[in-house]
Amino acid sequence: MHDNYRYYNRRPDGKIEEDCVCRAISTATRLRYSAVQKLLRISAGINKCDKLCVCCYKYLLEDILGYEPRYCRSEATVADIAAAYPERIVLIRIDGHLTCSAMGVILDIWDCTEEPADRYWIIT
């Protein structure tokens, strides 16, 4: 386990589920988990997609909440992005997963620090 990773499960019931999108967005934005679920359902209805798919959370983050996407250089890892923003809250996307970095520490249910990142959003 890396020093810049901390286990954190934002789900109110504590279950380990495949809901990284809701967990990460709720953690980063500090919106209630249930509020993020509702926003994702609305986004899914508008985009006619699953609430956890990329187009759905991209729409929520960029079009509804107004966060600007930033694209990674090809060799950047989650740890690299977290280290680049040690005083910020950042949502980081990897293939099939969305995670949150807060003050340089990855908050997630698994250590994805060495995974290659392709896109991120600075939240605060």
Language-model features, listed with the residues they occupy:
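Active-site nucleophile-adjacent alpha helix/oxyanion-hole segment immediately C-terminal to the catalytic cysteine
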Residues: M1-G66
